[in-house]
Amino acid sequence: MRLMSKLLIGTAMAAALCMPAAAKDLNKIGISVGLLGNPFFVATIKGIEDRAKEINPNVEVISVSADYDLNKQVSQIDSFIAAGVDIIMLNAVDAKAIAPAVKKAEAAGVVVAAFDVSAPGANVTVMTNNVKAGEEACNYIAEKLGGKGDVVIINGPASSSILDRVQGCKEALGKHADIKILSDDQNGQGSREGGLAVMQGLLTRFDKIDAVFAINDPTAIGAELAAKQLNRSEFIITAVDGAPDIEKSLASGNSMIKASASQDPYVMAGQALKLGVDVLNGNKPAEPIVLLDPQLITADNVKDYKGWTAAR
C-alpha cells in the first residue's frame, strides 16, 4: 500500500513538472524610455498601452522618462520593483551599464522586455535592425555624392540602437575610398536642441560639408535649423526614424533632409509587450531577440509611407 502511495505521489509530481506554468494576470506595467519628449517614444508608449488593454482593460501603466540619464533610469527600475509591476518595458539609455538593474528586476520576479535598444539580461528584445538602418541612410548619401565627399556623423547617447546605426553608416561609407568622415564623435543627445548645438559647432569648424548623417530625426531637424541660421545649404542630411516631422520635410521638397530609415515604434513596443506577457505566463519565446527591417523614406516614396500617427 505504501509502495502504491509513493508511486502515485511520484506520478503526480512528474505530471506537475510537465505542466505549463499557470497564467498570471497582467495588472501593472512600468515603462522607462530615453526621452518622453521624443515623438518616437510617444508612439511606443501608445503601442504598449493599446496591446496591454487588449489583455486587461484595467491594467495600470506607469510611464517615465529617463532623460538619457543612467542613474535616473536605474532609480526608476528600483521604483518599479517596489511598486510591484509585473513587466518592465525598458528602453535602456546605456546598453551595457543597465545590466545590473535588469538583473535586480528579474531576481525580484519581474519580467524585463526591452524595445528599440538591447539590454543585457532582458527576457525579450524587439528592435529595428539598426545596423541596416544606418547602412541604408548612408548608402543614400554615398549614392547622392557619387562616392566622393566630406561627411559628418552627429552621434548620440551610448545606446545599442545608436551604436548600431553609426556602425552601419560607417560600413556603408567605408566602401567608398573618396568619402571622408570629418567627425563622428559629437553627441547631439538624440534631441533637436542637441542636434542644433552640435551642428553649429561643426559648421564653424568645417568650411565645406557634403552630407550629414544624424542618428535620429530630432537630431536631423536640429542640424537643418543650424544650417539655416548660419546660411549654409551645401549639404544633404539623412537620419533614422521616419517621424511625422520628417514626413512633412520630405513631402515639402525643399528640405535639406532627404531621407530617413523608418521604424515602427508602435508595432515594435507592442510586440515586445506581447513577448513579455508570454514570458510572464511561463512561455519562453523561440526567438528572444526580434529585429524589424527599416524602410528608407525619401521624397519619392513618402506619399505611400504609413507613419507613426497612422490609424491602427
Q: Predicted segments — roles?
A:
Residues L3-L8, L17, A22-R312:
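A residue-level marker of the well-folded mature domains of exported/periplasmic proteins
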